[in-house]
Amino acid sequence: MSSHGNSLFLRESGAGGGCLQGLQDSLQQRALRTRLRLQTMTREHVRRFLRRNAFILLTVSAVIIGVSLAFALRPYQLTYRQIKYFSFPGELLMRMLQMLVLPLIVSSRVTGMASLDNKATGRMGMRAAVYYMVTTVIAVFIGILMVTIIHPGKGSKEGLHREGRIETVPTADAFMDLVRNMFPPNLVEACFKQFKTQYSTRVVTRTIVRTDNGSELGASISPPSSAENETSILENVTRALGTLQEVISFEETVPVPGSANGINALGLVVFSVAFGLVIGGMKHKGRVLRDFFDSLNEAIMRLVGIIIWYAPVGILFLIAGKILEMEDMAVLGGQLGMYTLTVIVGLFLHAGGVLPLIYFLVTHRNPFPFIGGILQALITAMGTSSSSATLPITFRCLEEGLGVDRRITRFVLPVGATVNMDGTALYEALAAIFIAQVNNYELNLGQITTISITATAASVGAAGIPQAGLVTMVIVLTSVGLPTEDITLIIAVDWFLDRLRTMTNVLGDSIGAAVIEHLSQRELELQEAELTLPSLGKPYKSLMAQAKGASRGRGGNESVM
C-alpha cells in the first residue's frame, strides 16, 4: 500500500474527524496522477503505440473494410470477370509473396543448418519432431471428439449441394508420391513442379484356350510315339478339334509418371537441410557459402519489409473477392452450417486452448502477448490461405517483433510450413467422420483409429498451398472405404474453413519456434560462445570443452522436451 494510504489509516485511528479530509486528499492526488498519465499518453505513448503497431492496425482495418465492402457489393451481382478485376490487387499480393517463398525456404534452411553444430541440430530436430507429432495428434483427437459430440452429419445428404469433382487417388500411390517428392531428380524442376502419379487406361488382350470339358489344352496333345496305336492318335485329334479358343479384351488402369504445377517445397527443404549440414561440417572452408546464403536471406527479408506495406491492401481485396465469389450465402446454414460450426469450434479449442497451454507449460510465460506479436502473420494467413505464402511475414514477426533467435526460426519455420499442419489434420479427421455420418455409416473403434493415423500422416503431405487439404482428404476417406465423391458436399464452405485452418497452422509453427528456442537455450549459448570468442585460443577451447561436458552431464537426465 502507498504512503498516502498509510497516512490515511493513521489519521483514522488518531482522529475520526480527519478521516474524511484524508480520504479526499488521497482521491485528489490519485486523480491528479491519473490525469498526468493520460496527458503523457496522449502526447507520447499513443503515438509510440500507433507507430509500433501500424502494420497490425492497418491489417485488421483491411479485413473489416474488405468484409464490409464485399457485403455492400453483393446486391449488385457482379459477373465473374468483374470479380476477377476487383480481386486483382489481392492477386498481386499473392504473387509477390509466392515470389519470395522459394529463395526464402532455401536460404533460411541452409543458413539455419550451417550455423549449428551436428549435436545441437540433432537435439533441436528431435524436439521439433516431438512437438509436431504431439500437436498434430492432439488436433486430430479434438476433431474426432467435436464431430462425435456435435454430430453435424445427422440427417440425409440429399439436402446438401455438391460442387466440383474429386479425383480418386489410391492411398499407396499418394504416400509413394510424398516420398518421391522428398528426393527430386532435378532441383531446377523442383522449383516449379511436383511429382504426381497420373493414370491412363490400356487395352489388355488375353487368349484362353480350353478343351470341351473345361480344362486347358496345355500338354494334352503330345507328338505320337511309335508305341501309340491308331486309336490313341484318333483320340488326340478328336480332343484337339474339341478345344475352344477365346480372346478376352479388357481395359486396365495403370499408374504413369506425371507432374503438377507448384513448388516442391518438401524436396527443397530436404535438400537444403542436407546442404546446410554439409556446409556446417566444412567449418572455415564453407564460410564463403555460409556468408552467401546468409546475405541472400537478409536481402529477402528486406524485400519482405517493403512488400509488407502493401499487404493490407492485398488482404482487403482477397477477402472481399472471395466473399463476392460465393453464389449462395445460405449454404452456411442448415446441416452444412453445423459442420462449419463444428470445424470452427475444434480449431478454436486447438488454437486458443491447446497451443497457448503448451507455450505456457514450457516457457512459463503468458502466451497471449506472443500471439499478439504474430497477429499480422495470422491475418495474412487468413487472407492468402497459404502457410507458405505467409512464411515471409511469419519470419518478420518472430525475428523482428518478438526477438526469436534467427537460428531457430530458420531451423523450424520452413519445415513447419511444409509438414506441421495441425489445422489440416483436425479438419481432415472431422470431415471424414462427417461424411460417414451423412451416409449413415457407423464407424467402429478400429476405423476411427485408422482415420486418426491416416489424417496425421496425410497432413504431413499437404503442401502449404490453398485447399491442399481437399486432395489429401481423399487418402483419409479411401482408408476406411468412404465414398470420395462426397467431398463435393463440403467444397461450398471449404474456402472459408481453409483460411481458419491456415491460421491454426501458422500459429502452431510460431509457437513451436518459441518452444524450441526456450528448450534449446543451452545449445544456443554454447554455439554463440564458440562463434564469438574464437581468439582466446587453447584456454578458451579447454574452457568450452569443460562447459560442454558439464552440459552433457546435466542434460543426461533430461528428456528431449
Swiss-Prot record:
This is Excitatory amino acid transporter 4. Contains eight transmembrane regions plus two helical hairpins that dip into the membrane. These helical hairpin structures play an important role in the transport process. The first enters the membrane from the cytoplasmic side, the second one from the extracellular side. During the transport cycle, the regions involved in amino acid transport, and especially the helical hairpins, move vertically by about 15-18 Angstroms, alternating between exposure to the aqueous phase and reinsertion in the lipid bilayer. In contrast, the regions involved in trimerization do not move. PROSITE patterns: NA_DICARBOXYL_SYMP_1, NA_DICARBOXYL_SYMP_2. GO terms for biological process: establishment of localization in cell; L-aspartate import across plasma membrane; L-glutamate import across plasma membrane; L-glutamate transmembrane transport; neurotransmitter uptake; regulation of membrane potential. One of its GO terms (cellular component) is membrane protein complex. Na(+) 2 binds at T418. It holds the Pfam family SDF. L-aspartate binds at S385, S386, S387, T424, I465, P466, Q467, A468, G469, D498, N505. Coiled coil: none annotated. Residues 368-398, 448-481 dip into the membrane without crossing it. It comes from Rattus norvegicus. Sodium-dependent, high-affinity amino acid transporter that mediates the uptake of L-glutamate and also L-aspartate and D-aspartate. Functions as a symporter that transports one amino acid molecule together with two or three Na(+) ions and one proton, in parallel with the counter-transport of one K(+) ion. Mediates Cl(-) flux that is not coupled to amino acid transport; this avoids the accumulation of negative charges due to aspartate and Na(+) symport. Na(+) 1 binds at G416, N420, N505, D509. SUPFAM superfamilies: Proton glutamate symport protein. The chain crosses the membrane at residues 53-73, 96-116, 130-150, 259-282, 292-319, 341-362, 408-434, 495-516. Homotrimer. GO terms for molecular function: glutamate:sodium symporter activity; high-affinity L-glutamate transmembrane transporter activity; L-aspartate transmembrane transporter activity; L-glutamate transmembrane transporter activity; metal ion binding; monoatomic anion transmembrane transporter activity; neutral L-amino acid transmembrane transporter activity.
